[in-house]
Amino acid sequence: MMIFSTAVLRLCATSRIGAVTKRASSTFLSSASSSSSSSSPTQSMPPQRYTHHQFQRHSYSTTTTTLQQQQQPSPPLSTAQLVKQLRLLTGAPMLECKKALASPDVNNDLALAQEWLRKHSSQKIGSKVAGREALEGLVGVCIDNCDGGSRGVLVKVASETDFASRSEVFTGLVQEIADAAAAAAGDGGDIVDIPTFLSNTQSITTGKLLSECLNDAVLSIRENIQLDSIVTIGTTPSSRSVIAGYVHGRAPNSTCGTSAALVEVEVLPKDGGGGDDAVLSEEEKSVAMEAAKKLAMHVVASNPLYLNPESVPVDVVEKEREILMEKMTDSNKPPEIIEKIISGQLRKFYEGICLTEQSHLVEEGNPKISKVMKGLGLVVKDFRLVGMSK
């Protein structure tokens, strides 16, 4: 009983203390509120409260205002910004960009300014640099591995200086021409008329005529740029042929170089195979591609003139034979011995100018190319070599 009374007394004391604390806290907050209201010149407003529908309307209004602010058009570019952007697009000097934008027909329109530069500056610069020698440049390559076989193209584009030929503008132009030439060669075979090709063929990447692309490059680089030659290989492709290439002296960040070669290799049908039109297996294609690539490297290094002895013109062989006969005039050897000597010297002559008769510079031990191809079940059908000095 004594223990229960003690617990009750403690509980009552705790309740009294809590009540006193609560009254003191209320008195303090009340006095603080009255003092702040008396010191403030204006009476503080109660916090704004929204009903559910009012809150929805308020949120929609705020969102609409934010979207309208985001959709406001950006301020127009300044003249300096327009000049800088036009220079980045065309590569033209600052003064010409400023002149183009200030033209009454342009009125600070970037698209019209580019057209203005093409019409006025390109013609002026083109006529100015037309007579200059263009002895530097690059060779571009494009191989189109289509369903019916492969086609390859080499294009030689010349510039005045090596510095210009290494620029991004020039390498881009060379590759554009090579890609377009590969597509054109697939439609109509060899490309002979270069001016007509440039005037009638569109860039695959930009859709502009190649002649316009070339003029744009002249405007940007300020040098004489000429498409010197277009060489094609495999324009009537076979399903059993592959083409591989090698580019030497590549420009930075480019597939173009100072010289390049393409080699076409045909896979011979195996005994009991599907015939000439049978589709190559992945293994056959891989072996043929590797062999063609190595041959292309060899071609760039050795610079052969003909594919095999049968492809050497008769007049070239006869002229070489006459030279060899003159050397043997005072030898006092029997005619049959002289003929054997001349035949041996002609074989050496073929080794120097015919691809299939040369020692393979890329294969270990430098075996004869015709022997390497026979061992792989391949035949070299054709090759092309283009270089800035060839």
Swiss-Prot record:
One Gene Ontology cellular component annotation held by this UniProt entry: mitochondrion
GO biological process, one term: mitochondrial translational elongation
Biased amino acid composition, Low complexity: 30-40
Coiled coil: none
CDD domains: UBA_EF-Ts
Transit peptide: 1-24
Molecular function via GO: translation elongation factor activity
Ranges where the record places region Disordered: 30-54
Location of the protein in the cell: Mitochondrion
Keyword Mitochondrion carried by entry: yes
Family to which this protein belongs: Belongs to the EF-Ts family.
Function according to Swiss-Prot or TrEMBL: Associates with the EF-Tu.GDP complex and induces the exchange of GDP to GTP. It remains bound to the aminoacyl-tRNA.EF-Tu.GTP complex up to the GTP hydrolysis stage on the ribosome.
Protein name, UniProt field: Elongation factor Ts 2, mitochondrial
